[in-house]
């Protein structure tokens, strides 16, 4: 294994660090990935684990997503979002009903704002983590039937998972496959980026130009894995990230390096940050 000093020598020679695995992000890619979690659902209101069970958006959930769509259609309105003014080249979404409907509402919001409407594409790799025998149950019911397995999942998610469900390693494999495809598409025809520029916000970037970007509509659990994959973090960081209902999160790719620009940008009720968190952090939200 190379030492950091050896990797630094390779970097000075214009060579990438010698690591065992091929990098997920294409070298030199400049792009933006925007994550939008689905809106409130019936199961979230009831405090039930969703996993891959179908559960519809509530009327409030549809309103949440429609507001997020208008925000994305006017990204540079005050306060601005750190995303390009151009439309995304694709809206890739989990094929589950709650995310499919959320993606449709985002497209409707783009159209209502007179913006170009990006194509929709279902991506099975963005499905929520399968929670097996826990799906449809409340945490109280899970604890009564399965003892401390839920507590173990919340403490060591990289080591434990629901009976009949998916391990995070299994989820990571499908997430990486989906991201590899999307990142390759983003790199198609994109201008190669460079790290030879300011990496601290606030400085003018005179080389900046509109970047290609992709909009992903998914779930809180799978998005945690997406962020770990893009940042090169191990899965024991799973619970370090959280995603609000219908909130917008932005990851910028700078010359092949993922940088979090913001998590949980949220227009909220009538353009304000929501103060009523009913359903946002319900234990059945995963």
Name each model feature, range by range:
Residues 36, 92-94, 217:
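Short hydrophobic segments within beta-strands
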């Amino acid at each position: 294994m190379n030492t950091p000093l050896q990797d630094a020598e390779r970097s000075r020679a214009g060579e990438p660090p010698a690591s065992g695995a091929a990098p997920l992000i294409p070298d030199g890619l400049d792009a933006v990935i925007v994550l939008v979690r689905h809106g409130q659902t019936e199961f979230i209101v009831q405090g039930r684990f969703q996993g891959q069970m179908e559960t519809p958006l509530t009327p409030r959930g549809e309103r949440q997503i429609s507001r997020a769509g208008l925000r994305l259609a006017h990204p540079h309105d005050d306060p601005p979002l750190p995303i390009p003014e151009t439309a995304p080249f694709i809206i890739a979404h989990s094929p589950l009903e709650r995310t499919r409907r959320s993606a449709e509402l985002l497209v409707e919001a783009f159209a209502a704002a007179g913006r170009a409407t990006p194509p929709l594409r279902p991506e099975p790799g963005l499905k929520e983590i399968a929670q097996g025998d826990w799906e449809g149950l409340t945490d109280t019911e899970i604890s009564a039937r399965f003892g401390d397995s839920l507590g173990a999942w919340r403490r060591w998610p990289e080591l434990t998972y629901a009976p009949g469900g998916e391990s995070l390693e299994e989820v990571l494999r499908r997430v990486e496959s989906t991201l590899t495809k999307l990142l390759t598409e983003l790199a198609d025809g994109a201008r190669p980026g460079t790290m030879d520029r300011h990496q601290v916000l606030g400085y003018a970037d005179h080389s900046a130009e509109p970047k290609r970007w992709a909009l992903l509509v998914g779930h809180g659990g799978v998005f945690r894995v997406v962020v770990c994959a893009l940042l090169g973090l191990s899965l024991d960081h799973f619970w370090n990230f959280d995603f609000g209902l219908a909130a917008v999160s932005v990851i910028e790719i700078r010359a092949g390096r993922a940088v979090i620009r913001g998590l949980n940008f949220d227009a909220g009720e009538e353009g304000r940050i929501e103060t009523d968190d009913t359903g946002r952090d319900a234990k059945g939200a995963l």
